[in-house]
Amino acid sequence: MLEADLVSKMLRAVLQSHKNGIALPRLQGEYRSLTGDWIPFKQLGYPTLEAYLRSVPAVVRIETSRSGEITCYAMACTETARIAQLVARQRSSKRKTGRQVNCQMRVKKTMPFFLEGKPKATLRQPGFSSDFSVSKKPNPTLLRDKGNSLGVKSDAEMPPYTLHTTLRSEVFKDVPVQRHVTMSTNNRVIPMCSHPDVDPLQYVGSVFKKHKYLRFSPKASLPPPFQMHLSRTCAKEMNGNLSQTVEKPNVTPPASYTYKMDEVQNRIKEILNKHNNGIWISKLPHFYKELYKEELNQGILQQFEHWPHICTVEKPGSGGQDLLLYPAKRKQLLRSELDGEKVPPSPLPAPKQIPPLKGCPAVMPGDFKEKVAELLTKYSSGLWASALPKAFEDMYKMKFPEDALKNLASLSDVCTIDYISGNPQKAILYAKLPLPTDKILKDAGQAHGDYDIKSMIEQEYLQIEENIAKSVDTFLENTAVPPLIIPTEASPSVLVVELSNTNEVVIRYVGKDYSAAQELMEDEMKEYYSKNPKVTPVQTVHVGQLLAVNAEEDAWLRAQIISTEENRIKVCYVDYGFSENIEKSKAYKLNPKFCSLSFQATKCKLAGLEVLSDDPDLVKVVESLTCGKIFAVEILEKADIPLVVLYDTSGDDDVNINATCLKAICDKSLEAHLQIDAMYTNVRVTNICSDGTLYCQVPCKGLNKLNDLLHKIEDYFHCKHMTSEYFVSLPFCGKVCLFHCKGKWLRVEITNVHSSRALDVQFLDSGTVTSVKVSELREIPPRFLQEIIVIPPQAIKCCLADLPQSIGMWTPDAVLWLRDSVLNCSDCSIKVTKVDETRGIAHIYLFTPKNFPDPHRSINRQITNADLWKHQKDVFLSAISSGTSSPNSKSGSTPVPGSTGDNFRKSLTDAIKKSVVDHTSSLSVEELPPPVHLSKPGEHMDVYVPVACHPGYFVIQPWQEIHKLEVLMEEMILYYSVSEERHVAVEKDQVYAAKVENKWHRVLLKGILTNGLVSVYELDYGKHELVNIRKVQPLAAVFRKLPFQAVTAQLAGVKCNQWSEEASMVFRNHVEKKPLVALVQTVIENANPWDRKVVVYLVDTSLPDTDIWIHDFMSEYLVELSKVN
C-alpha cells in the first residue's frame, strides 16, 4: 500500500473515532496516540498540515467556527466504519497524566484463569484507603442514598438558584421501587404543567418562587401520569423479583435522593442529546465524569431499560455485551391535572383471567362510552386498556364488547389514550375531567361544557408568565455566573483576542467545555430570542447589568454594561473581551438559563515581558504576532490573571512567542551590522560547534554597553548581600537571567527545563549551550533589567566561506584544529562575503593576527589540509582543548563559558567526582548493575509502559523505581554537560552513556554505521535510537548502580502469530505511557539484564468501578476484526 493511501486510511480511522470532530491543533497528537507516528504531510509534498487535509476531501471535512477554530470531521466510508466503531469504544480522548492510579482490582464476572488474592495498594487514587477490599457487584435494581454516591453534589453544596435552573418536566418522574412520591406545602397541592406550549423550566421555576418554603414531603402524591409510570415500573420489578423484598411499597424516598436522581437523569439526557447517533453504555461514565467532574454510579447503568423517557436502549446484533443508548423519543401527550387525593394505583390484570359473564345484557354504543368515562373517573392514575374489560364487567355486570379494544380510537372522545412504545394494542386510558361546575352548568341548560384541562392550564400559564416577568429582574440580579476554571490539561489551546499591555492579554480557551460550549449557548440564545415574540428590549439599564445583545450577522451575545447615555450604551462582550457602543434597542434582558456558562473572555500575563509590559513597540509586536491566532499555552502560575508562555505549534518546531517578541524589540542600534566585503578586526571567536559553525563577537556599541552593565552588576552583587529574591524560583523557556562563570556574570537564556533541578541554557553573547543547576542562576536586578534585555545577543553566527564541496561532514580532527587555532583569540580578523538573513548566518574569511590580510593564508585555506579530513573510525574529540589558548592569544583571555568552568565543576557532588577515575582503561571490566526486581509468577506488580509495539512485544518499568530513575537522569545531565569528552573505541554490545534529544541515557550499543551514527538501545526506556557517535560517552561508575529499568514483556491470555497494524495501533493506544497493574505469569531469566523477558496479564485500573483486562479487550477486538474481514 502506498504511504499516501496508508496515511489516508489511518487518518480516516482516527477521525471516525471522534464523532464531534477534532480541532486542528490536536489532530497530530490524536493521530500519533493511535498510530505512533506523526502525519507526514511534508513527505507527501505539502507545506502545512492544513494544506494536506484540504487535498483529501474524500477523507476529511474541514469546518471553521465563528471563533476561528478549525475542526476536522471524517467523511463516510463503509470500509473502515466498523473498525472506527471499535476504536471509539476503547479510546479515551483525555489521557491520564497523573502518576496516581487505582490498583484495587474488582471481581470479574468471568475469569479466564484462576485468581487468588488481590493486588497491592501502591497506586491508590486519592480518596481510596489502602485497606479497601474488593468491591462487590453493584445492585442493579436499587440505588441507596448515601451522601454523594450518585455522582452529584450534595444538597448542602448546591447554590440556592440551582433548584430553579436544573429541574425539568421530568421532576420526580422516575423513582424505582416506590409507588408514591408527593409534593406539598402547607397542605396545598402544586399542579404540574402539562400544556404542550408551556416551558417546563419556567413553569417549575415559577412554582418554586411562589412557594419558597417548599419542601418535599413523603405524604402527598404525584400527578396521575407520574403515578402510572411509578406503578408500572414498580410492578414490573416486583413481578420479576417476587422472592426478594426490596423495600416497603409505600415508603417514599428522601427528598435529597429524588432530587439527585432527577439531576442525574437530566445530565444523562444532555449527554445523549449531544450524541444523536447513539453512545455505547460503557463510554457513558467517561463522558459523564469529563463533563460534570463527578463519578457516575455504576448501578444507574442497570436502570436505563426502565427509563424510556430518558433514553432508548438498543442491543447490537454483534453479540457483544455492550448496549447502545439513544435520546428518548418525544411524545406530545396531554396529561391530566393532579387532584389532591391519594388514589391507589390501577390494578394490573390478574394472572388467571375470569371468563366473561354469560347472559349479561348487551351494551349500546352510546351507553357504553358513558359507562367507560364513568369507570375511568375512579382511576385517576389511569387504567391499562387490557384491564378495562374485567373492570367494566365487575362494575356494571355487563358483557364488554368484543371489538372495543381493537378500535381504541373510538373512545378518544370520552378519554385520553396514552399509547406505549407506539403499540396501538398497548395503551393507558385516562378520564377526561370536566370543569368542577360542568355538571351544574349542564343541568342549568348552559352550553359551556367544552372546557377541558388545556384551557385551564393556558389560563394558569398566562398568570404564571406575568409573575415570572415581574420577578425575572430580581432573579437575574441574584444569579451568579460561575467563575471560569483554568483547564487542567498540560498545554491547553487559547485564542488571543486583544491586548492593551502584555500583563493583560485577553484570551479565550479553545475546547469542548469552553469555545464549543459557548457556540452551543449562542445558538440557543439565537433560537430563544429570534422565535420568542414576547421578548422586548430593555427599558431601564444600569452599569454592570448583564444583557443579551443582537450583534452583527444576527448573532446573539452576552454583554455587560460599562456606561450609559440617552439612547446608547457601551457594553463589553463578556465572551469575547472587546467593547462596543450600541443602541439601546439592541439590548434585551438576559434569560437566567444563559448564565450557567462562565464568561469565556479572560486575561493572562506573558512571562518574561513584565518589565516592558506598557512599551508601545512591544505591544505592537505582540499584537501583530498573536491577535486572532490560536496557540498552545504553558501555564506557569494559576492565578486570577495566570502567568503564561505562548507557543506557536503550527510549524515543524514549536516557537516560543514570548521570547520571539522580546528579541523583536531589541535596540537595533546596538547590533553589529555586518557589511558584505567589509573587514573587521579585534574579533573574538567565542564558540566552535562540531559542525564547523563559529560564534564571534565583533566590536560594536552594543558590546561595549553590555560589558559596562555586567561590570555594574558585578559591583552591585559585591556590595549587596545576596538574598533569596535573586534566586530563580520559576524557570521557564525563554527566560533571560545571569550565570556566574570564571569570575564574571554572563547573560543566559533558558532553552530547556529538564526538571526542578536541571535545565539547559544558551549563553546569549557567546553561543555556548550547556546544562546547569537551577540554583546557580540569578535574576537580573530590577534596576538593570530593562537596560540589559534590550541589548541584542552579541554572538554572531558564522561559517567559513568557500570550503571545497568534497569536504563533506566535519571530522573531529578538523574541529579540534580549528579550536586550537582561533578559539578565544581576541584579535582575529574577518572578511564578510555573504550574509544569509533567512538562516541568520554570515559567510566569512577568518584570519589570525599574523596572517591578516593575506587570503591565501586565511584559516579557510589552511583547514583544507587533507590530513584533517580523513574520517577516522570511532574517534572522539576532546573538549578540554576549548579552554586552551592558541600561541598567539593573550594570557588574560576569557575561556568558553560552561565548557570548563571551575564554579560549575565544583557544584557537582564529591561522589560524582570520585567516580570518574580513568574509565578509558577500565571500561571492559566495569560491572553491570544487578537485574531489576520482578514479582514472582502469580503475583501482581505495578508497572509503567513506556513503549508498546504490539501485544507480543512491549516494555515495562517497575513503578516504584521510576522516581530513582528520574533522579539519576538529572545527575547524568549535570555531569556530562561539563565533563570532557573522552577518546574511546566503542564496541558492540557494550554499555555507554548517550545523549538522545537533550537528555543522557544509559544505552547498549547495538551497531556502528559508516555515516558517523551508531544504533543504541535505551536500557531504561526500551527504545531504539540512532545517535551521532560523538554523543556516546563512557558510563560513569556512579550511574551503574541502579538496575536497568526496561524489561521486555509479552501479553498473556491472547494467541496471535501476526499482529495487524490496526490491532497494534489499538493495543498501543490503550497501554503505552500508562501506569497499569501486571499479573506475572512467567519470568524468563537471562545472563544479560536487557535480554530478560516476562509474560504478564495487564489490567487498567484507572476507572473507579471497572477493571479493564487488556487480554480480554484484545481478544474481543480480534473477534470483531475477523468479522469485518
Curated annotation (Swiss-Prot):
Region feature (Interaction with CABLES1): 920-1125
Top-rank taxon: Eukaryota
Alphabetical GO biological process terms: lens fiber cell differentiation; lens morphogenesis in camera-type eye; P granule organization; piRNA processing; post-transcriptional regulation of gene expression; spermatogenesis
Cited Gene3D superfamilies: 2.30.30.140, 2.40.50.90, LOTUS domain-like (3.30.420.610)
Biased composition (Low complexity): 881-895
Comp. bias (Polar residues): 127-138
Region described as Interaction with CDK17: 888-1125
Region (Disordered): 126-157, 881-904
InterPro entries found in the cross-reference section: LOTUS-like (IPR041966), OST-HTH/LOTUS_dom (IPR025605), SNase_OB-fold_sf (IPR035437), TDRD7_LOTUS_3 (IPR037978), Tudor (IPR002999), Tudor_domain_containing (IPR050621), Tudor_TDRD7_rpt2 (IPR047448), Tudor_TDRD7_rpt3 (IPR047449)
Annotated localization: Cytoplasm
GO cellular component labels: P granule; ribonucleoprotein granule
Residues annotated with Phosphoserine modification: 346, 886
Alphabetically ordered keywords of this record: Cytoplasm, Differentiation, Phosphoprotein, Repeat, RNA-binding, Spermatogenesis
One GO MF term: mRNA binding
Disulphide bonds in the chain: none
Pfam families from the UniProt entry: OST-HTH, TUDOR
Main location: cytoplasm
Quaternary state and interactors: Found in a mRNP complex, at least composed of TDRD1, TDRD6, TDRD7 and DDX4. Found in a complex containing CABLES1, CDK16 and CDK17. Interacts with CABLES1, CDK17 and PIWIL1.
Similarity section: Belongs to the TDRD7 family.
Function: Component of specific cytoplasmic RNA granules involved in post-transcriptional regulation of specific genes: probably acts by binding to specific mRNAs and regulating their translation. Required for lens transparency during lens development, by regulating translation of genes such as CRYBB3 and HSPB1 in the developing lens. Also required during spermatogenesis.
Name of the molecule in the record: Tudor domain-containing protein 7
Organism: Canis lupus familiaris (Dog)
